[in-house]
Amino acid sequence: MRESAGRYRPPVRPRQPAVRRKHSRLAVDVVASPGLRAPGLGAWLSSLAPVRARGAVTVAVVSDARVRALNHRYRRKPLVTDVLSFPSEDPGYLGDIVIAAGVARRQARQAGHSLQTELRVLALHGLLHLLGYDHERDNGRMARIEARLRSRGGLREGLIERHR
């Protein structure tokens, strides 16, 4: 798929079928740039998804340059960021979560944990944005939900806490 007429299109096509956990209503496709692996990320995110997370989502782990270009095009910010979320208008498809691989590596080093842990932190944060939460405007609601899910998923720190 390609970007066209100002509408977002996923940066890469999923190569494997979506992972849907036995008790989850969320199917997660994970696609990563060549040379990068994200084992278990889809199953982990699906297992933690809030009840209202129904349908499918794609998590794409791409280059910093790709994220910078997407951030500039869709948010008018010519900077690389760690994670972007692109909600879908299709009721069966929540949207896309795009993670900058280089930023994730650097943040993992700074936080003292693995890249896989950082990918989980970023994917969870992106999923909550796809569900409509906005930590800049919701008086801590997203932070509380993220903290609860993070704890359930074995993560000690989330993205919102880091930036406070």
Language model features: what each stretch is:
Residues 1-119, 128-164:
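An acidic/histidine-cluster motif and surrounding catalytic segment
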